[in-house]
UniProtKB/Swiss-Prot annotation:
Protein name: Nicotinate-nucleotide--dimethylbenzimidazole phosphoribosyltransferase
EC class: transferase
CDD domains assigned: DMB-PRT_CobT (cd02439)
An example Gene Ontology biological process: cobalamin biosynthetic process
EC number(s) stated in the UniProt entry for this protein: 2.4.2.21
Pathway: Nucleoside biosynthesis; alpha-ribazole biosynthesis; alpha-ribazole from 5,6-dimethylbenzimidazole: step 1/2
Reactions that this protein is recorded to catalyse: 5,6-dimethylbenzimidazole + nicotinate beta-D-ribonucleotide = alpha-ribazole 5'-phosphate + nicotinate + H(+)
InterPro entries xrefs: Nict_dMeBzImd_PRibTrfase, Nict_dMeBzImd_PRibTrfase_bact, Nict_dMeBzImd_PRibTrfase_N, Nict_dMeBzImd_PRibTrfase_sf
Active site: E317 (proton acceptor)
Record's keyword annotation contains Cytoplasm: no
Organism: Pseudomonas aeruginosa (strain UCBPP-PA14)
Length: 351
């Protein structure tokens, strides 16, 4: 395994299929452009899948979990034990993403990269447990270099399993108490933006809690700020095991030619890191929604992303991405199933 495998070449979209899909859209029985962004979504998927009529029948959902040492600074409204407790909920079918994956006919993989509280072996959970959570990043780097590399590789391996299953779309989700703090710190470093613009309530902090969270991140940036220009160092110093796995998954999707649907704030920060590690992966990332965390908008703008939904979501788990899948499927169905003007014997407008 190359220590910097993420620099490997990404697959390219098929320009011929993009052209053919665009031509088909222009021949369908509707005014050109009348289906708005659904038309471009179908065209983009055609180019990425190399098929004039793309399909999203087979989905893969992985939730990556990991705890964060910065929780010791009092930055979360919930105790750290919740991370492990939610793993049980995921595999027992009671979490939001469990319900949504079931409704979509998608399998759900759960990967424990580093819960702070050891868990019993749970059927349906891959217990990698690279560490008992990250270190407190106001005192030291969140991860060692080897831990970060292993977490990136865990994301890559999840995509490999998705590919072997014949999946056409990858959704990554996350679970980790304290991970909005890590995501905000990473976003500040990667965007060179003020902390106040990128920090929000996470799982439910009040105004004083947000102010404290802001101060904690400012301390972390003061400690690690000299490494802002290096996305790998930013990831390992300020990120989390699950965030690294997400970044690795997005990079692997681009290298294998699988579309990734990016969820909320934390996933979008992981995507931003992936793009900084290998800019060519950007074409393979679709963005599901614009979430309630104030920093999410800034990250999406930096990625020139056009999210599909805006529902005020802030749950994570991959839930927002799962909610956007029916929209993508309908875009594909319209593109493939509508008749052309010639097929329907309907008069087109004059050329």
């Amino acid at each position: 395994m190359s220590l910097q495998w993420w620099r490997d070449t990404c697959r390219e979209a098929d320009p011929q299929m993009r052209r053919r899909a665009a031509e088909r859209q222009d021949r369908l029985t509707k005014p050109r452009g009348s289906l708005g962004r659904l038309e471009q979504v179908a065209i983009d998927l055609a180019a990425l899948q190399g098929r004039e009529r793309p399909s999203l029948e087979r989905l893969w959902v992985t939730v990556f979990a990991g705890d964060h040492g910065v929780v010791a600074e009092g930055v979360s409204a919930y105790p750290q034990a919740v991370t492990g407790e939610m793993l049980r909920n995921f595999v027992r079918g009671g979490a939001a993403i469990s319900v949504l994956a079931r409704e979509l006919g998608a399998g759900l993989e759960v990967v424990d990269l580093g819960t702070a509280v050891p868990l019993e072996a749970l059927p349906g959970v891959r217990h990698l447990r690279l560490a008992a959570g990250t270190a407190n990043f106001v005192e030291a780097p969140a991860m060692g270099a080897e831990q970060c590399l292993l977490a990136l590789e865990a994301g890559r391996e999840s995509v490999r399993r998705a590919e072997q299953a014949g999946s056409q779309l990858f959704i990554g989700g996350e679970m980790g108490i304290g991970n909005t703090t890590a995501a905000a710190a990473m976003a500040c470093a990667l965007l060179d933006a003020p902390v106040s613009a990128l920090v929000g309530p996470g799982t439910g902090l009040d105004a004083s809690g947000v102010a404290h969270k802001t101060a904690v991140i400012e301390r972390a940036l003061a400690l690690h700020g000299a490494h802002r220009a290096d996305p790998f160092e930013t990831l390992r110093r300020l990120g989390g095991l699950e965030i690294a796995a997400l970044a690795g998954a997005y990079l692997a999707c681009a290298q294998k030619g699988m579309v990734a649907l990016v969820d909320g704030y934390i996933c979008s920060v992981a995507a931003l890191c992936a793009v900084r590690l290998n800019p060519a992966c950007r074409d393979w990332l679709l963005f599901a929604h614009s979430g309630a965390e104030p920093g999410h908008r800034h990250v999406l703008e930096a990625l020139a992303a056009q999210p599909l939904l805006d529902l005020g979501l802030r749950l994570g788990e991959g839930s927002g991405a799962a909610l956007a899948v029916p929209l993508l499927r309908q875009a594909c169905a319209l593109h493939a199933g509508m008749a052309t003007f010639a097929e329907a014997a309907v008069s087109d407008r004059p050329a």
